[in-house]
Swiss-Prot record:
GO terms for molecular function: GTP binding; GTPase activity; metal ion binding; structural constituent of cytoskeleton. One of its GO terms (cellular component) is microtubule. It comes from the Eukaryota. It comes from Hypocrea virens. The keyword GTP-binding applies. This is Tubulin beta-2 chain.
Length: 446
């Protein structure tokens, strides 16, 4: 079966990763030791996409946990599902990257990367037919962004034909953890544009908004945010983990979602989002799910798709859903909001169905959108980047690790190019094809 190897790097990546494993273990009927106690054949049928069956019926996640300091790892190991993971797959340094991309990418991280690759290789060899990798990390810190992108490029070299999906927590406009976030994020995006096949952008601020507005939590903790992210990750991977009518794998998803190779940064959403304890008071319908799923307030990245247009999007419905009803709803959305979809890609909404709903819900839907409005996010980071870079603020932390200013300039211009590519396709219409055909090759010659 088509296996996926999961890699989590840095503090943020490990916390999201831990929440993800907790969620999908529950969906597959595994307890915190990886022992199966479920009731449905469907839970077992594709278990091996994410789990390796060890002896005595224990299922072990195909997960590699990486960090440059032991703290987060110890927390994962001591957490509710700490006994699930293979002990050899915890790889950590002692020094920490100190929110410095250069440390994660060039010095501290580079020392550890070979150990990590050995473990990844071993996991990959245990697969019948490896489909690809997924990485959870944040772009604002040092380890997840610097070492995460280093791992991605190394894996790319070694497994050039496998898919690479990343769940990347991007810095948010108002909530900032560190001053140098714009540097770390820009340097990471520079790598992701080249090396990732699909990047799901998640943003803490949007998650805070969802927690406060929709889930009515007065002061959300990271646990609540991670719960949202794991719901989306579980939704995106649902077609890979359960047999369904319309199955997709990472590659099919990419084929449907990425019209131009560099434009693979997706916005994600999830429905129904109800406050814990409220969902038992109402039944959810497909029209409601669709409505909520396309609601800007539900997007987990703080850019408003009403300022741009969708190139493509994909919706994944789970539960007992009628195919016909879903298709009608999708057609309905497209007709009502036709201005938000580019007209030069017909049928740009893809739908997938899976009969098994998440725990505690009758139905749910996950949304993945490739919208040109994601450029807002890159623009925002880019402005913060150039404000600091112009004054060479904090630059000595990076040059001290052997980086060159040239790299910063390159990363900045690559990100600006990305923004203008999104803008170009946002404005493109059907009628002006001729001029684009001449321009297009020049755009993508990197």
């Amino acid at each position: 079966m088509r296996e996926i190897v999961h890699i989590q790097t840095g503090q943020c990546g490990n916390q999201i990763g831990a929440a993800f494993w907790q969620t999908i273990s529950g969906e597959h009927g595994l307890d915190s030791n990886g022992i199966y106690g479920g009731s449905s054949e469907l839970q077992l049928e594709r278990m091996n996409v994410y789990f390796n069956e060890a002896n005595n019926n224990k299922y072990v996640p195909r997960a590699v946990l990486v960090d440059l300091e032991p703290g987060t790892m110890d927390a994962v190991r001591a957490g509710p599902f700490g006994q699930l993971f293979r002990p050899d797959n915890f790889i950590f340094g002692q020094s920490s990257a100190g929110n410095n991309w250069a440390k994660g990418h060039y010095t501290e991280g580079a020392e550890l990367v070979d150990n990590v690759l050995d473990v990844i290789r071993r996991e990959a060899e245990g697969c019948d037919c490896l489909q690809g990798f997924q990485i959870t990390h944040s772009l604002g810190g040092g380890t997840g962004s610097g070492m995460g992108t280093l791992l991605i490029s190394k894996i790319r070299e070694e497994f050039p034909d496998r898919m690479m999906a990343t769940f990347s927590v991007v810095p948010s406009p108002k909530v900032s953890d560190t001053v140098v976030e714009p540097y770390n994020a820009t340097l990471s995006v520079h790598q992701l544009v080249e090396n990732s096949d699909e990047t799901f952008c998640i943003d803490n601020e949007a998650l805070y908004d969802i927690c406060m507005r929709t889930l009515k939590l007065s002061n959300p903790a990271y646990g609540d945010l991670n719960y949202l992210v794991s719901a989306v990750m579980s939704g995106i991977t649902t077609c890979l983990r359960f047999p369904g009518q319309l199955n997709s794998d990472l590659r099919k998803l990419a084929v449907n979602m990425v019209p131009f190779p560099r434009l693979h940064f997706f916005m994600v959403g999830f429905a129904p989002l109800t406050s814990p304890g409220a969902h038992s008071f109402r039944a959810v319908t497909v029209p409601e799910l669709t409505q909520q799923m396309f609601d800007p307030k539900n997007m987990m990245a703080a850019s408003d798709f009403r300022n741009g247009r969708y190139l493509t999007c994909c919706s994944i419905f789970r539960g007992k859903v009628a195919m016909k009803e879903v298709e009608d709803q999708m057609r309905n959305v497209q007709n009502k909001n036709s201005t938000y979809f580019v007209e030069w890609i017909p049928n740009n909404i893809q739908t997938a169905l899976c009969a098994i709903p998440p725990r505690g819900l009758k139905m749910s839907s996950t949304f993945i959108g490739n919208s040109t409005s994601i450029q807002e996010l890159f623009k925002r980071v880019g402005e913060q980047f150039s404000a600091m870079f112009r004054r060479k603020a904090f630059l000595h932390w990076y040059t001290g690790e052997g980086m060159d200013e040239m790299e910063f300039t390159e990363a900045e211009s690559n990100m600006n190019d990305l923004v203008s590519e999104y803008q170009q396709y946002q404005e493109a219409g059907i009628d002006e094809e001729e001029e684009y055909e001449e321009e297009a090759p020049a755009e993508h010659e990197e």
